[in-house]
């Protein structure tokens, strides 16, 4: 599902909300979540899951085209851990 499809579904289910209001709410929520992760905060949405950063250590990779070894720096990557309610609902 894309962001546009999500907006359409919410507008369809919640007839009193306009598409612009829903779009603004979703964009604002995603921006706030991105900013929180960028500053190292953990985001927890009860019943859904949590977002955090995991550190990937520096390593030696390989360019698949040339086979040449490449040094890759360590970096933080976003990580999502689903909550129990979400896991249960998906496995129904």
From Swiss-Prot:
One biological process term in Gene Ontology: DNA recombination
Classification via InterPro entries: Hist_DNA-bd, Histone-like_DNA-bd_CS, IHF-like_DNA-bd_dom_sf, IHF_beta
SUPFAM superfamilies: IHF-like DNA-binding proteins
One Pfam family from the record: Bac_DNA_binding
SMART domains: BHL
Keywords, alphabetical: DNA recombination, DNA-binding, Transcription, Transcription regulation, Translation regulation
Entry keyword annotation includes Metal-binding: no
PROSITE patterns: HISTONE_LIKE
Record has Nucleus as a keyword: no
CDD domains attached to this UniProt entry: IHF_B
A GO CC term attached to the entry: chromosome
GO molecular function, one term: DNA binding
Quaternary data: Heterodimer of an alpha and a beta chain.
Family: Belongs to the bacterial histone-like protein family.
Function statement: This protein is one of the two subunits of integration host factor, a specific DNA-binding protein that functions in genetic recombination as well as in transcriptional and translational control.
NCBIfam families given in the database record: hip, PRK00199.1
Name recorded for this polypeptide: Integration host factor subunit beta
Name of the gene encoding the protein in the UniProt record: ihfB
